[in-house]
Amino acid sequence: MTEHNVQRVAIAGFGAIGKVVAEHLDRGIDGLSLAAVSARDTKRAEAAMAGFAHAAPVLSLARLGEFADIVVECAPAALLREIAEPALAAGRTVIVLSCGALVDNFDLVDLARRQGCRILVPTGALLALDAVQAAAVGDISRVHMITRKPPNGLAGAPYLVQNGISVDGLNEAKRVFTGTAREAARGFPANVNVAAALALAGIGPDRTTIEIWADPAVDRNIHRIEVEADAARLMFQIENVPSLENPRTGRLTPLSVVALLKKLSSPLAIGT
């Protein structure tokens, strides 16, 4: 592929997810190149890229769209607008992992429409997202998700802090939340992007219902999803191994981003 046809990729956030994505880009994905990264700790990011074949410059979030055709958001949910808005205004494709934050910043979709560009949400840990999207073309009557996480993967979530709910020293599973996907996204911004992606693929954040459990007996992030539709009844479960660097996210998440990037430049695309 000629240099002219190569799409430049910038990564916003260089932690447990962003670093893995950058490593794959540096090793080589056909049709793509790592153009820039953004990180809170510039020196740490530069040191992490010391072994890269082609180290990328570390820039501010607002400047990523100047250097790239695709901006991958791998940052805390509170930074979504700061990352996505300038990139979309410049007509760039934006890959959003903090899709929980996207639920309450849906005007970004309108901005993408006006600018003729796209926001892409990776499948992440959500098995059968394609099936949910297909079912939504027909009629879906119910979508329910039960999430179980090790207590340390939920510690510090705003909903727990605001409601005085402790997950320390648990000896048995404790249900800490029940409500809609929209409420879950606000209360657990670092924990339940899976719920937001499920809601956006299906019947929306206000009709999708969520339970969240802190369970000391599990060592994985477990998501059980039940979908009732006129075309099918779907029941599936994902047991995602938590990231060593950040237990709030799973190891599958960065790999899903890499798979999406490969799909963008591949002559063959599998899935809806």
For the regions a protein language model found, what residue spans apply to each?
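General beta-strand structural signal in soluble alpha/beta enzymes
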Residues: 73, 96-97, 119-123
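NAD(P)-binding Rossmann-fold cofactor-contacting core
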Residues: 28-49
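Rossmann-fold NAD(P)-binding glycine/threonine-rich loop
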Residues: 98-118
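N-terminal Rossmann-fold NAD(P) dinucleotide-binding loop
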Residues: 18-19
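Alpha-helical segments flanking ligand/cofactor-binding loops in enzyme cores
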Residues: 23, 85-86, 110
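Extreme N-terminal starter segment of soluble prokaryotic enzymes
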Residues: 4-9
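Beta-loop-alpha module in the N-terminal Rossmann-like domain of NAD(P)-dependent dehydrogenases
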Residues: 59-89, 100-105
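Active-site-lining helix/loop region of Rossmann-like oxidoreductase modules
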Residues: 12, 125-272
